[in-house]
């Protein structure tokens, strides 16, 4: 890694409060990834959309930001990162869905709670000349940020990095929807109308959205049980940051609240753990400690110990 790039990466590591040894992770796993993206972008006839899919706590947003840095600093590409979280429906729109379809749709997260039309419009705009406003969602208010607070950039860009917990997940078969997967579904979706609605969205408008992904990277958790542990770890870190800043932390979730919250995501997370590896261009197998154990490129049977090139 050249000195200027190493300095940029070390600054990124400090900002993200990652361990210093993460610089070796970048050199081993993610510099080759950026080089592979460059090769794809060089032959693409449009703005390349790189998808990063993975469960909660898997490191999607960190990798998305890092990949944009590498593409810019190392390879000179114009790149921007987006999260599917930025395209949530407004709180009022979700409340309407909760009244018309199912109360669980008031909670943001699952397919059916995003503005897919806005997401597709944004992707199209990033591939055409002009100023583009990037939507932002304020999780503290559980609502879309005012448009005047959306950052803008000059398009077209070479690469869009889109990350999300359910990105590229395929719909389930109807038979798989019959039995509840957890207490939330058993008690609050006994008839199955919520999970059927969510699955219909995956098969419908979300399929068009996910089809825009040209190159899919999967951060593969070892199991769903680890997802809860990772999400709890995120909550603990947030509590520490709030305490250090002298804030009350009233928005933090206690363990029962967090467990219920994650149950909204459990069905599609489990399904993605099984279905996505066969569809991803690159799969990073994660350890329980959230380090990379191995990399596989191009579907099953293509393991690599140190590179995606």
What are these regions (language model features)?
Residues 1-49, 55:
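Extreme N-terminal, non-catalytic leader segments
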Residues 2-3, 17-23, 27-30, 166-309:
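Conserved NTP phosphate-binding and transfer environment spanning the P-loop NTPase/kinase superfamily
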Residues 21-22, 80-83, 87-141:
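Conserved nucleotide-sensing/catalytic segment adjacent to the nucleotide-binding pocket
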Residues 49-55, 81-84, 216-218, 283-284:
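Extended hydrophobic secondary-structure segments that form protein cores and membrane-embedded regions
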Residues 60:
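Conserved lysine of the Walker
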Residues 63, 67:
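Hydrophobic positions on the alpha1 helix immediately C-terminal to the Walker A/P-loop
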Residues 69-80:
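Post-Walker A helix-loop "phosphate-sensing" segment adjacent to the P-loop in P-loop NTPases
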Residues 122-169:
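Phosphate-binding/switch loop-helix module in NTP-utilizing enzymes
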